[in-house]
């Protein structure tokens, strides 16, 4: 999980999701693409 000021999709399988006031990126193909805005 990377914590970044600006989250972007890293591949076409990444999805941007808003959970508990945080913007997250989840990826079913590559778990390294997980990010959270912080």
Swiss-Prot record:
Q: What top-level branch of life does the organism fall under?
A: Bacteria
**Alphabetically, which GO biological process terms does the record hold?**
translation
Q: Which UniProt keywords apply?
A: Ribonucleoprotein, Ribosomal protein
GO CC terms for this protein? cytoplasm; ribonucleoprotein complex; ribosome
Which InterPro entries does this entry report, sorted A to Z? Ribosomal_bL36 (IPR000473), Ribosomal_bL36_sp (IPR035977)
One GO molecular-function entry: structural constituent of ribosome
Database matches in Pfam families: Ribosomal_L36
Family stated for the protein in its record = Belongs to the bacterial ribosomal protein bL36 family.
Cite the NCBIfam families for this sequence.
rpmJ_bact (TIGR01022)
Q: What is this protein called?
A: Large ribosomal subunit protein bL36
Q: What is the lineage of its organism?
A: Bacteria, Pseudomonadati, Pseudomonadota, Gammaproteobacteria, Enterobacterales
